[in-house]
Amino acid sequence: MKSGRFIGVMSGTSLDGVDVVLATIDEHRVAQLASLSWPIPVSLKQAVLDICQGQQLTLSQFGQLDTQLGRLFADAVNALLKEQNLQARDIVAIGCHGQTVWHEPTGVAPHTLQIGDNNQIVARTGITVVGDFRRRDIALGGQGAPLVPAFHHALLAHPTEQRMVLNIGGIANLSLLIPGQPVGGYDTGPGNMLMDAWIWRQAGKPYDKDAEWARAGKVILPLLQNMLSDPYFSQPAPKSTGREYFNYGWLERHLRHFPGVDPRDVQATLAELTAVTISEQVLLSGGCERLMVCGGGSRNPLLMARLAALLPGTEVTTTDAVGISGDDMEALAFAWLAWRTLAGLPGNLPSVTGASQETVLGAIFPANP
C-alpha cells in the first residue's frame, strides 16, 4: 500500500483560487504539512463561468481552456514544491479534482465534466496524477457527488456524538456522520455561489468580505420565498447540483418579479437563502449535536450566526476547531482519494451517491520512471 507525501489540488465551483495541499497519508492518518492558494487569472475565471452558464464555444476554445487549466494546476503544484524545497521524487502522487464545468447526473445519459488536462500536470511537474474521480460513480448509477463525505467520515466521525460536516463552497454540501447509521451526504443547494455572483456584477468585488454588504441590507421575504420554491430544495437525497443550475441566470429569473430592489437587500436575501436551505436539510436529516463547517462560507460571520440561530440545539463550529483547516478540506480530501486509488481501495460511498456499489475512483496518469 503506497504511503508518503501526496498533493491535493482543488478548484471548486466558487472559483476563488486553486487550493493546493501537501500531506503525508497512510492507512492510519492524514497529516497536513503545507498549503497555498494560487490565483486564477480573471480571463480564465470568466471563460469557466461562461461555459458553466451554457455559453457556446468551439471545440478549439474548449481544448484551449482544458490545456490552460492543466497548466495553471501544474504551476500551483510547482509553486508549493518550491516553497517547501521539495522535488518531484519526494511526492507519491497528485490528486487533482479538475474544474467542473458541467454536472448532469440524471437523465438519458448522466454525465459530469471536469477539465484541466492531467497530462499537462504530469508533463510539467514530473509527478503521477490521479484525476477524473467522479465518472466511475456515475457509470455505476450514482450522482458522482458528493465524494468528500467518505473523507469526512474517515477523519471526523465520532463513536457516540451525532455530527455533521458542512462544506460551504460555491455549492453547500452536507456529510451526515451519525453513529449506527450509514454515512449520508448531499448538496443542499447554493453556498457562496449566488452571493459571489451578485456582488461581482453589482460592485465588482469577488466576494462579500465579512458579509459587509449583506449585513447592510434587509432580507426581502417574498423574494426569499420565491427562491425557496425551487424544486431542487424539496428533492430527496441522493442529489447533487452545480453552477450549471444555480447561476446568475437562475437569480435573474427570480429577480424579474422584484424590480428596483436595493442590491444590498438582495445580498442579504441570498445569504439567508443559503442559511435556510442548509438548516432545513440539517433538521430534515434528523439534526445533530455538532455541525462542523468548512469552506469559504465558514469565514462568513453572517452565515455562521444565522446557522447558529436557525439550529439552536446544535453546536455550530468550524473544522479548524478540531485541527483541520476549513480552507483546505476539499484539496486534502482529493489527496486522500488519490491515495485510496493507488492503494486499490474504493473512494465512493453508495449510501451517499446512490451508486450500485463501492468502487475504486479515478484515472491514473503515471509519470515517467
UniProtKB/Swiss-Prot annotation:
CDD domains: ASKHA_NBD_ANMK. Keywords: ATP-binding, Carbohydrate metabolism, Kinase, Nucleotide-binding, Transferase. InterPro entries: Anhydro_N_Ac-Mur_kinase (IPR005338), ATPase_NBD (IPR043129). GO terms for biological process: 1,6-anhydro-N-acetyl-beta-muramic acid catabolic process; amino sugar metabolic process; peptidoglycan turnover. It comes from the Bacteria. Catalyzes the specific phosphorylation of 1,6-anhydro-N-acetylmuramic acid (anhMurNAc) with the simultaneous cleavage of the 1,6-anhydro ring, generating MurNAc-6-P. Is required for the utilization of anhMurNAc either imported from the medium or derived from its own cell wall murein, and thus plays a role in cell wall recycling. Belongs to the anhydro-N-acetylmuramic acid kinase family. This is Anhydro-N-acetylmuramic acid kinase. The gene is anmK.
